[in-house]
Regions:
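Glycan-recognition and catalytic cores of secretory/periplasmic carbohydrate-active enzymes
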Residues: 1-392
Length: 392
C-alpha cells in the first residue's frame, strides 16, 4: 500500500469519526431522544422537527445498539450510554405483546399501534441488549440478549406462530442474513453454542440455496431447494442487501483468521452485488434489479436509498482488507464520494434517505419508521475502524 493510499484511509477514518461525534449523534440526541417517555422518535424533518410521534420498535433496538456501540467504539460518552439504556427500557416496558412477540410500531407513550409477521424488532432488541452489556459489563443484559435470540428462534420454528406472508413455499434472504449479525454481536458478550451454530447454518444456507450461479446473485427468495421462483418477486435482486450479507460473512471470516471458504463466499457475493447494483450512468447503488433483466416491480426500483450506499462503503473496505486488491479501494472511493456528494446534508446535518436515480433529493426528511440512527452511524463507526486498521 502506498503512502498516498494510507493517507486517504486515515483521512476517511478521521472524517467518519468527526461526523459521528459532531453531527450524527448530536442530531439524534437533540431531535430524537424522548426525554419524557423514554426511547427515541425517528419521524423527523430535514431540520430535525418532529413530524410524527409514532415510534418504530425496530429503532428502539437499533438506537439502543447504535448509542452503546458509539460508546464502545468511539467515545465514552455517558449520555450515549444512558440513551441506549432508555431505549432498551422502553422496549422491555412497552414493546412486547402478551405472546412474547414484539410490536412494529407504538405510540409515544408505548401503546401498541401495529404488529407484523416478522421478528426484526426482536433482532434489533437483542443486539441492543448485547452491545449495552458489552459497554457496562452487565451479565444480566447479556443473558437478556440471548433470551430474545432464543425467543426469535422459537417463533421462527413454531408452525403458525408467524403468519406466512405468501402461500409460496421457499426460503428468504432477509432473516437468514440478519441472524448472522445478531449471533455475531451476541457472541462478543456471551458464550452459547447455538450462536456459532446459527452463523454456520445461515452461511451454509446462503451458499447452498440463495446464491445463484446462473444469474450471479443472491436472490431475495427462492424455492425450498434453492429453485428460482420465476415471478417478479422471485427474480428480485436487492444489491444493498447482498452487499450487507457479504460484509457480515467477511466479518465472520476475519474473526476466524480469514477463513478461506468464508472469505471466498463474501467476496463472491460482494462482486456479484456490485455488478448488479452500481449505476454506471448516474453512480450509486440502485435499489432493485430483476435477475432476468425485466423491469423490477417495486416502484422505488431505480431510486438510490441511503442504506445501500452505507453498506457499499463498509463492504468495499472489508474486501480490501481481505485481499489487498486495489480495485476494492477504488470501489470504496467511488461509493464514498458519491454518498458524500448526494446524501450528506452539509447544511442541516445527517443524511437524506431517498434520492432519485440521478442523485437528486426525492424528499428531505431525515427519518421515518424505517430510517433513523442506524445505517449511517454504523457505517461511520465501522468504516472508521476498518480504514484505520488497514492503514496501519
Amino acid at each position: 500500500m502506498t503512502n498516498e493510499q494510507k493517507q486517504y484511509l486515515r483521512e476517511c477514518a478521521d472524517l467518519y469519526r468527526k461526523e459521528l461525534v459532531e453531527d450524527v449523534m448530536p442530531f439524534w440526541m437533540k431531535n430524537g431522544v424522548d426525554r419524557k417517555n423514554g426511547g427515541i422518535y425517528t419521524c423527523v424533518d430535514r431540520d430535525g422537527t418532529l413530524m410524527d410521534t409514532t415510534k418504530s420498535v425496530w429503532f428502539q433496538g437499533r438506537w439502543g445498539w447504535t448509542a452503546a456501540a458509539a460508546y464502545n467504539l468511539v467515545e465514552k460518552n455517558e449520555e450515549w450510554l444512558q440513551a441506549s439504556k432508555s431505549a432498551i427500557d422502553f422496549i422491555e416496558k412497552h414493546c412486547v405483546d402478551a405472546d412474547g412477540h414484539m410490536f412494529f410500531t407504538v405510540t409515544a407513550e408505548g401503546a401498541p399501534v401495529q404488529k407484523r409477521r416478522y421478528v426484526f424488532s426482536e433482532s434489533f432488541a437483542a443486539i441492543a441488549m448485547a452491545e449495552y452489556a458489552k459497554a457496562t459489563g452487565s451479565v444480566e443484559y447479556a443473558h437478556k440478549a440471548l433470551e430474545v435470540f432464543r425467543a426469535m428462534k422459537r417463533m421462527l420454528s413454531t408452525p403458525g406462530f408467524l403468519e406466512p406472508k405468501t402461500t409460496v413455499q421457499g426460503r428468504g434472504h432477509s432473516i437468514t442474513m440478519i441472524l448472522i449479525n445478531v449471533a455475531a454481536v451476541l457472541k462478543e458478550v456471551i458464550d452459547a453454542p447455538e450462536l456459532d451454530e446459527q452463523i454456520d447454518s445461515s452461511i451454509n444456507d446462503i451458499e447452498r440455496y440463495l446464491m445463484n450461479e446462473e444469474y450471479k446473485t443472491v436472490l431475495e427468495m427462492v424455492g425450498p431447494e434453492g429453485e428460482l421462483i420465476d415471478t417478479c418477486a422471485g427474480r428480485t435482486i436487492n444489491p444493498g442487501h447482498c452487499i450487507e450479507t457479504a460484509w457480515f460473512i467477511l466479518a465472520e471470516a476475519k474473526r476466524r483468521g480469514w477463513d478461506e471458504r468464508l472469505t471466498r463466499i463474501g467476496l463472491t457475493i460482494f462482486d456479484w452485488a456490485w455488478e448488479w447494483g452500481w449505476d454506471n450512468e448516474y453512480g450509486g447503488i440502485i435499489n432493485f434489479r430483476d435477475c432476468k433483466g425485466f423491469p423490477p416491480q417495486d416502484y422505488s426500483q431505480d431510486m438510490k436509498f441511503w442504506w445501500p450506499q452505507c453498506e457499499a462503503i463498509i463492504g468495499a473496505l472489508y474486501c480490501y482488507e481481505a485481499t489487498g486488491d486495489e480495485k476494492y479501494l477504488a470501489l470504496h472511493r467511488k461509493a464514498h464520494e458519491w454518498a458524500y456528494a448526494h446524501l450528506k446534508d452539509h447544511e442541516m446535518g445527517e443524511w437524506y434517505g431517498y434520492l432519485h436515480r440521478d442523485g437528486s433529493v426525492a424528499q428531505p426528511a431525515k427519518g421515518n419508521i424505517f430510517k433513523g440512527p442506524f445505517h449511517v452511524p454504523r457505517m461511520l463507526m465501522m468504516a472508521a475502524g476498518l480504514a484505520e486498521e488497514i492503514a496501519k
